[in-house]
From Swiss-Prot:
The lineage of its organism: Bacteria, Pseudomonadati, Pseudomonadota, Gammaproteobacteria, Enterobacterales. It comes from the Bacteria. Pfam families: RepA1_leader. Keywords: DNA replication, Leader peptide, Plasmid. The gene is repL. This is Positive regulator of RepFIC repA1 expression. One of its GO terms (biological process) is DNA replication.
Length: 24
């Protein structure tokens, strides 16, 4: 997996976790 794709995946995953925490 290219570094940029991995970074984007990690960023989106982190955003999902953070937003899920805020929604709770």
């Amino acid at each position: 997996m290219p570094g940029k794709v991995q970074d984007f995946f990690l960023c989106s995953l982190l955003l999902r976790i953070v937003s899920a925490g805020w929604c709770d």
